[in-house]
Amino acid sequence: MKLTCVLIVAVLFLTACQLTTAASYARSERQHPDLGSSDQNSKLTKRCLASGETCWRDTSCCSFSCTNNVCF
C-alpha cells in the first residue's frame, strides 16, 4: 500500500515537471520565433521547377511529373 502511494506521488510529480517544462518551452518559442528551426524557414522559400527544366524526382517539379529527367 505504501509502495503504491509512493509510486502514484512520483508519477504525479514527474508529470507536473514535464508539463511545466513543456509550457515554458512553448512560451520561449513564441517569444523568440527567429530561434526556431531554419529547416522550416527554408521549406517556405524552396521553389519548384517549371515545365521543361531538368529534374531528378517528381516532387521537385511544380506539376509533380518528372519523366526522363524533364518536368512536364
From Swiss-Prot:
Q: Using the record, list the residue span of the signal peptide; answer none if the entry has no such feature.
A: 1-22
Where is it found, in Gene Ontology cellular component terms? extracellular region
Q: Give each disulfide bond as a residue pair.
A: 48-62, 55-66, 61-71
Broad class of the protein's primary localization? secreted
User: Which InterPro entries does the UniProt record give?
Assistant: Conotoxin
Q: In which tissues is it expressed?
A: Expressed by the venom duct.
Keywords attached to this Swiss-Prot or TrEMBL record, sorted alphabetically, are: Cleavage on pair of basic residues, Disulfide bond, Knottin, Neurotoxin, Secreted, Signal, Toxin
- Key word Transferase present: no
**Propeptide stretches in the record:** 23-45
Gene Ontology MF: a single term: toxin activity
List locations, semicolon-separated: Secreted
Protein family: Belongs to the conotoxin O1 superfamily.
- What does the entry's free-text domain comment contain? The presence of a 'disulfide through disulfide knot' structurally defines this protein as a knottin.
Output this protein's name.
Answer: Conotoxin VnMKLT2-021
Q: Which organism is it from?
A: Conus ventricosus (Mediterranean cone)
